[in-house]
Regions:
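Histidine-anchored nucleotide/phosphate-binding helix
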Residues: 59-80, 249-260, 266
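Short acidic-hydrophobic, aromatic-tinged amphipathic segments that line or gate anion-handling sites
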Residues: 30-38, 102-110, 206-210, 334-343
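Glycine-rich phosphate/diphosphate-binding loops that line cofactor/substrate pockets in enzymes
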Residues: 38-55, 75-80, 224-231, 259-262, ...
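Well-ordered mid-protein domain cores that form the structural environment of catalytic cofactors
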Residues: 63-113
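C-terminal non-catalytic interaction/assembly regions of soluble proteins
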Residues: 249-250, 254-373
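Short glycine-rich or small-residue beta-strand-to-loop segments that form or flank ligand, phosphate
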Residues: 50-64, 85-88, 233-235
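Conserved, well-structured core segments that form the ligand-binding/active-site neighborhood
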Residues: 102-236
């Protein structure tokens, strides 16, 4: 049997599956940029000076390599080290441990403090990891800023997505609105294509529109093709928050649910030690969200997941491997099992012991394109 390891929270678990039951393992090829080339790229493309703010909009493991190089270059230039902030809720244990291990000084900042903080510095550098996103098409610094700091813009974007299916990998109206809103933002940008272990590519820009070129290259590198499958296993753990809460995990689902035939089964690894995020999902499971009024609401955090579930949960059997109480998942129309083997057994019961599944280990950096049925 092959060893297929899938991310589950901060760890990995093995999917004990035979070769003959695997249609394809769908993941992008990730090349490794050498430490020397990484340093050279940062040296040649980033302006460092006194009064510099470095903002990480999504914490991810390989950000630490970039921050160490920025600090080294600052020492060589004999300038003050930049102030580094992460746009984050209280740091997860793994993130705190990794920061401590590297002896880096990184502080946390809340969204309501951020815009004022940016105005206090002469030089601002935004850093993030590019991922797929079912609302914006792609996620990184620009979209994270809109989600966290521009509620009125999110209302506008939400109004354009009503009754629409997830659109990962498409540069549509939501991304257009994002670019227009942030067009006057004066900053440098570093966007990264990486998994948990290595960096493949690093993209630089000196205005917000550079993000569009970054995601174009990212999509070319991370798209893969496959036949439709009757079932799939979807997971990821390439950021510190990939499966932190249910909303994070559902993003993984929406990015590649389309690789499965309607009526098929999707097993989603969704540890969710952070539970259900404060927002639309928690309001719904507590009976405080009227589904008949979704088109009348202003944007509530993660309301897109309620909308997508309404559109898709009757078309697929969605099974979660999760620590969340089943009573929560029942209200969302989702099933759960305690072990990944139980998910595989349910697929065999439904489709037969010779059925084949697609396996998508890093769904936030994978775009599956289906061959014609």
């Amino acid at each position: 049997m092959p060893e297929v390891w899938l991310g589950y929270g901060d760890s990995e678990i093995i999917l004990d599956i035979k070769y003959e039951n695997i249609l394809r393992i769908l993941r992008p090829e990730i090349k490794v940029i050498s430490p020397e080339n990484l340093r050279l790229n940062i040296h040649n493309n980033i302006n460092l000076q006194n009064s510099t703010l470095v903002l990480i909009t999504t914490p991810f493991p390989k950000m630490l390599d970039i921050l160490k190089i920025i600090n080294q270059l600052s020492h060589e230039l004999d300038i003050e080290l930049p102030d580094v902030f992460v746009l984050s809720k209280p740091f997860m244990l793994r993130l705190r441990q990794d920061i401590s291990k590297e002896s880096l000084s990184i502080a946390r900042i809340e969204p309501d403090e951020l815009i004022k903080k940016i105005s206090q510095y002469r030089n601002v550098i935004l850093i993030d990891k590019i991922q797929y996103d079912p609302v914006f098409g792609f996620a990184a610094s620009p979209t994270k800023l809109i989600r966290e700091c521009y509620p009125q813009v999110m209302n506008q974007i939400y109004a354009t997505t009503l009754d629409e299916l997830p659109k990962p990998g498409l540069s549509g109206e939501a991304l257009k609105i994002t670019m227009e809103t942030l067009s006057e933002l004066n900053c440098q940008m570093i966007h990264v294509y990486s998994d948990r272990e290595v960096i493949d590519s690093i993209y630089f820009g000196h205005d917000i529109n550079s993000f569009l070129e970054s995601v174009k290259s990212f999509k070319e590198k991370t798209s893969t093709t496959s036949d439709f499958s009757k079932s799939a296993f979807i997971s990821s753990n390439t950021t510190y928050t990939s499966q932190l809460n249910l909303g994070n995990s559902l993003n993984l689902l929406w990015n590649n649910y389309h690789s499965v035939l309607e009526g098929g089964t999707i097993v989603l690894l969704s540890e969710n030690r952070g539970g259900v995020n404060e927002g639309a999902i928690s309001k719904f499971v507590e009976g405080r969200l009227d589904l008949n009024g979704l088109d009348k609401y202003q944007y509530i955090n993660e309301i897109e997941h309620i909308k997508f579930l309404q559109l898709l949960r009757d078309k697929y059997e969605i099974i979660l491997i999760s620590t969340l109480p089943q009573i929560y998942l029942n209200k969302l129309g989702l099933k759960s099992v305690s072990k990944i083997k139980d998910g595989l057994d349910l697929i065999f019961t439904k489709n037969g012991k010779y059925s084949k599944s697609n396996i998508i280990p890093v769904s936030e950096i994978t775009m599956v394109k289906n061959n014609p049925a």
